[in-house]
UniProtKB/Swiss-Prot annotation:
Gene that specifies this protein: leuS
Name used for this protein in its record: Leucine--tRNA ligase
Gene Ontology CC: cytosol
Keywords, ordered alphabetically: Aminoacyl-tRNA synthetase, ATP-binding, Cytoplasm, Ligase, Nucleotide-binding, Protein biosynthesis
Keyword Zinc recorded: no
Motif 'KMSKS' region positions after renumbering to this chain: 618-622
Length: 859
């Protein structure tokens, strides 16, 4: 074996072997237990970042470990390759999105191979290819036929100057990113999939996901937002019109003092006809940012409509206001306002001098609403026949009254809205719907699929090429002239079923059910927690759609989910002459002074600018603190980068990038290499004879097999890869100090190194691949099994016993593992320190904790 550890040479050689032998290509095998490990596939942005490397290293470690368990392991990879960044890059670089995307895929594919990830490249998919999205289009038409797809108007960001729709990220401070025109909200027709029909199942089936993080399940429960309440009807005074309101707090209904409706509510638009102030306010509301964050932060404002509503129980009239905090696309677009028992309503009522009437108080006291609303549940008062009732009794009584009078009904509602899948972008899968000359909208016939997105286009930065290309939109269906839909799918569509396509990526159908049902569900899914409420919900929803279409036979797409933490790095900046922050790459920073905890106090860049250190933050382009994986691999090798990624922190926590720790990982691999080299240099080894081992050898072998057991448990059950590595490092320290004088010393070292190489193989596979053969083993390490724990090695011949007198340590003794209490007591009492502290005293009691402690009570 070569003496020096040369990662670039070793890794190139091993990767070539994997490629030549197609090591990681797999097929279905009914005789082997399958294991499907999947990391969320990347967007081909151009270069891998350290977040990618962490995600994919975790997945590769799990996959390689499971392979050594003898399982048939599938680990595929592909590209989530549609999306807005490609359009922006195409505009910037005067090219089309397609070539930019395919070039990035080629580059990033080489980076993934360079890191040694064991993917089945024969299953590679790119979502921007017709071979992939044709089946998405086909499935959409089937959902339409089942009544799960519909079209309705929905609000979008609209630039009136360019006459184009903007994505949320293209709206900067309320203006168009391109021309700085104030952005408006515009209602346009869009396609929706009825995810709400699956809301109850999506909620209930979270209970099946025992191996998903509780945080993700809680976020999904809140996003789905199931609530039980009453939908009640309010009549408009002096009119035959009425409107519905849903509330989860019917116990407060007797305290309604006004009603708030959305700017888009029919009553608001009707009232605005002769009310210029209201009309102006409605326009202002229509152009407001309606994201949750913006709604929470904005000032709550309103304008009275001049209309009154009739309370469904008291018959009293209450004013109807238009409020900017009520959304037409949420609930019924109207809310009952009880300022005494809702803080938002309270502040609004105070602002506009509206009545505040308390109707709920604590069960054991009075209610004080002089400073704020009382929002807890309690006992009703000032509520006529409902006085004295608690929340549930009031809920039931008010429900019964409203139901009997035909003014309301108990109802389950969900916060979840139907999934709007239309995007007014170019670089996405065309939605397979056509409009006939008579205005009828139908799905594109199956024999005309896929509807291919033209790739040879020019991006003008204003309008989608397929919207401006009138010829592309023209088609013929059943001999009739028709026009294609020019919207494209939300890219969450592609990422909602890719995991299933991997099972049969070349099938001339959406899925081959036999193959899909062999591999699915995914056994281990890995990705960031930021995907909890969007991708991971659509992912689950799509699986149920596939199930109900007879394509899969399981309820959920993934058994186990690991959400890895972010990768952080130091961030530095200086203010330029205009006062703007200029972020400086860590590689361009010289630290001049640190505090006693090693934190930067003073630093400069290569041009001498004094820098402000902002601490560790997520690696990002905006803070220029990303570390290029390519540079690290070139400098230290892929195995070092992988080892650092798995050792620096538990997988679900943030990882702080420290190059000194990367150097430490590199030193450890070199130490492993040297230990193996030195052992091999001593020549052939004899067979290990466990019965002839001396006490020191037995102890070393015990540590070896304890480590094998712990590492397996840490990787498989606990997923604490960092502690698994730490255990192997501790064992290596013991091995380096172990004697190599006798044949059994060498035989024991051979057993230990054979085990260590397999324990570390999932993490540093290139190094371990070579060492496995250098140690004299036949065949590739991928084809061997994880080391077995020899239970007999764990049995201890002796035990260390702590001896105390009156609770204080006085001696430590070593006794036979099977020594009786009497034997331990005799040995303990004979110890010099015990004799000294019991002399002249009476032993009152002897307490023995078997195998651990002897406590002598004497006075």
């Amino acid at each position: 074996m070569q003496e020096q550890y040369t990662p670039s040479e070793i890794e190139a050689k091993v990767q070539q072997h994997w490629q030549d032998t197609k090591t990681f290509e797999v097929t279905e095998d009914a005789n082997k237990e399958k294991f499907y490990c999947l990391s969320m596939f990347p967007y081909p942005s151009g270069r891998l970042h350290m977040g990618h490397v962490r995600n994919y290293t975790i997945g590769d470690v799990v996959s390689r470990y499971q392979r050594l368990q003898g399982k048939n392991v599938l680990q595929p990879i592909g590209w989530d390759s549609f999306g807005l960044p490609a359009e922006n890059a195409a505009i910037k670089n005067s090219t089309a999105p397609a070539p930019w995307t395919y070039e990035n895929i080629d580059y990033m594919k080489n980076q993934l191979k360079m890191l040694g990830f064991g993917y089945d490249w024969s299953r590679e998919i790119a979502t921007c290819t017709p071979e992939y999205y044709r089946w998405e289009q086909w499935f959409f038409t089937k959902l339409y036929e089942k009544g799960l797809v519909y079209k309705k108007t929905s609000s979008v960001n609209w630039c009136p100057n360019d006459e184009t729709v903007l994505a949320n990220e293209q709206v900067i401070d309320g203006c168009c990113w391109r021309c700085d025109t104030t952005v408006e909200q515009k209602e346009i027709p869009q396609w929706f999939i009825k995810i709400t029909e699956y809301a109850e199942e999506l909620l209930n089936d979270l209970d099946q996901l025992d191996e998903w993080p509780e945080q993700v399940k809680t976020m999904q429960r809140n996003w789905i937002g199931r609530s039980e309440g009453i939908e009640m009807t309010f009549q408009v005074a002096d009119s035959d019109q009425s409107f519905d309101i849903y509330t989860t707090r019917p116990d407060t209904v007797m305290g309604v003092t006004y009603v708030a409706i959305a700017a888009g509510h029919p009553l608001a638009e009707q009232a605005a006809i002769n009310n210029p102030a209201l009309a102006e306010f409605i326009e202002e509301c229509k152009n407001a940012d309606t994201t949750e964050a913006a709604m929470a932060a904005m000032e709550k404002k309103g304008v009275a409509t001049g209309l009154n509503a009739i309370h469904p129980i008291t018959g009293k009239e209450v004013p109807i206001w238009v409020g900017n905090f009520v959304l037409m696309n949420y609930g019924t677009g109207a809310v009952m306002s009880v300022p005494a028992h809702d803080q938002r309503d309270y502040e609004f009522a105070k602002k506009y001098s509206l009545n505040i009437e308390a109707v709920v108080k604590p069960a054991d006291g009075e209610v004080d609403i002089s400073e704020e609303a009382y929002t807890e549940k309690g006992v009703l008062f000032n509520s006529a026949e409902f006085d004295g009732l608690d929340f549930q009794a009031a809920f039931d009584a008010i429900d019964a009254k409203l139901t009997a009078e035909g003014k309301g009904k108990r109802q389950v509602n969900f916060r979840l809205r139907d999934w709007g899948v239309s995007r007014q972008r170019y670089w996405g899968a065309p939605i397979p719907m056509v409009t006939l000359a008579d205005g009828t909208v139908i799905p594109t016939p199956e024999d005309q699929l896929p509807v291919i997105l033209p790739e040879d286009v020019v991006m003008d930065g204003i309008q989608s090429p397929i919207k401006s290309d009138k010829e592309w939109a023209k088609t013929t269906v059943n001999g009739q002239e028709a026009f294609r839909e020019t919207d494209t799918f939300d890219t969450f569509m592609e990422s909602s079923w890719y995991y299933a396509r991997y099972c049969s990526p070349h099938a001339d159908q959406m899925l081959d059910p036999a193959k899909a049902n062999y591999w699915l569900p995914v056994d281990q899914y890995i990705g960031g927690i930021e995907h909890a409420c969007m991708h991971l919900l659509y992912f689950r929803f799509f699986h149920k759609l596939l199930r109900d279409s007879g394509l899969v036979n399981s309820d959920e797409p993934a058994k186990r989910l690991l959400t890895q933490g972010m990768v952080l790095a130091d961030a530095y900046y200086y203010n330029n002459e205009k006062g703007a922050r200029v972020w400086v790459a860590p590689s361009d920073v010289t630290v001049l002074e640190t505090d006693d905890k090693g934190r930067t106090v003073k630093a400069v860049d290569s041009e001498g600018n004094e820098l402000v250190y902002t601490g560790m933050s997520k690696m990002s382009k905006s803070k220029n603190n990303g570390i290029d994986p390519q540079e690290m691999v070139d400098k230290y090798g892929a195995d070092t980068v992988r080892l650092f990624m798995m050792f620096a922190a538990p997988p679900e926590l943030t990882l702080e990038w420290q190059e000194s720790s990367v150097e430490g990982a590199h030193r450890f691999i070199k130490r492993l290499w040297k230990t193996a080299h030195d052992h091999i240099a001593t020549g052939p080894t004899a067979e290990l004879d466990v019965k002839s081992l001396n006490a020191a050898q037995k102890e070393l072998r015990r540590e070896l097999h304890k480590t094998i057991a712990k590492v397996g448990d840490d990787i498989e059950r606990r997923q604490m890869f960092n502690t698994a590595i730490a255990s192997v490092m501790e064992l290596m320290n013991r091995l380096q100090k172990a004697p190599s004088e006798t044949e059994q010393d060498k035989a024991l070292m051979q057993e230990a190194l054979n085990a260590v190489v397999r324990l570390l193989y999932p993490i540093i596979p290139h190094t371990c691949f070579v060492l496995w053969n250098d140690l004299g083993n036949q065949g590739a390490i991928e084809d061997v099994l994880w080391p077995e724990v020899d239970e007999s090695a764990l049995v201890e011949d002796s035990k260390l016993i702590i001896v105390q007198v009156n609770g204080k340590l006085r001696a430590k003794i070593t006794v036979a593992a099977d020594a009786s209490k009497e034997e331990v007591e005799t040995a303990g009492m004979a110890e010099e320190g015990v004799v000294k502290h019991t002399e002249g005293k009476t032993v009152r009691k002897v307490i023995y904790v078997p195998g651990k402690l002897l406590n002598i009570v004497a006075n």
